[in-house]
Amino acid sequence: MCTAATYKTDGFYFGRTLDYEFSYGDEIVVMPRRFPLAFRGGAALPEHYALLGMAHVADGCPLYYDAMNEKGLCMAGLNFVGNAVYAAPRGGRDDVAQFEFLPWVLAQCASVSEARTLLAKTNLTGTPFSAQLPAAQLHWLLADKDECITVESAADGLHVYDNPAGVLTNNPPFPQQLFRLNDYQSLSPRQPENTFAPSLDLRSYSRGMGALGLPGDLSSSSRFVRAAFTRANAVSGRSETESVSQFFHILGAVEQVRGCCEVEPGKHEITIYTSCCSAQRGIYYYTTYENRRICAVDMHRCDLDAAALARFAPRTEEDIFFQN
């Protein structure tokens, strides 16, 4: 289970939590402009926009969980088990396997508007990367500073939805998630007024009672509501550091703590990492479950005209600053 969100101050920020019971060996990976991309449908991109994000590198190929490109377009794939249905290959150059969907979009598109045009002619297939890495059932959040969309592949085709909430979790399908926000329209960050029975002497006995009823469990539908509420009401300074800090606080509202979500006896889902893409600066910030310090990789400190990946292992040991 995962949660992704967008946030805008003077800059545009995009990121996600990756929640799972184990890691595949994730790395922060810069894909420079001349890293050759060959897609299973036959298309090839010898040159393209540079990418930066978190990925599992298999046989030299970065399988991105989330990333941004040098133009500020961002994308993340989240579990959509039981609802994702991919098409069969048609034998054309626009056949794109699920695992290569993110670089297919980010390598070519500078904006959500351009991505919409590309998606209209893309046939998203369930072709696996390998026998050891079958096709993951995903849906995607895709955003730039001006637009945010959700992309879902279902039995009746590829759907592109406007996403005014700026968040995404997992099941159910996005239209149902968005509709469910209607149930919480009375919630507020402000203290409530007594509209229950003005004749009764009802008083707020605690701060935060305006949001009484906000879901607090770890299910994907509850995390969607909680993330949407937190994002919509978050107040931040305008600077880069203030914005990045606030973004991590927003996603902190849906973090998974070891022991609270048991997937089988002795195995628990945790927030393996949380990311924040500063889309206009090309900086990928992240924290890990074991290291709460915000770390960063700046794509512009790498050679973006190179042909080889630049790979950075995430810092996973707690980094505590002693003041005496």
Task: Please report, for each region that a protein language model flagged, where it lies by residue.
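C-terminus-biased signal that marks the final domain/tail of proteins
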Residues: M1-Y13, T127-F129, A135-A136, D144-K145, ...
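A contiguous strand-loop segment
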Residues: M1-D94, K121, G126, R311, ...
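Short acidic-glycine loop/turn motifs at beta-strand connectors
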Residues: K8-G11, N69-K71, A143-E147, E152-G157, ...
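Beta-strand residues in well-ordered beta-sheet regions across diverse protein folds
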Residues: G15, A76-G77, V151-E152, Y285-T287
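Short, surface-exposed beta-strand-loop junctions and turns on beta-sheet-rich folds
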Residues: Y20-F22, V81-N83, D156-H159, G166, ...
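Catalytic cofactor-binding cores of redox enzymes
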Residues: K121-H159
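Proteins synthesized as precursors that undergo proteolytic processing into mature forms
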Residues: G92-P128, E240-H249
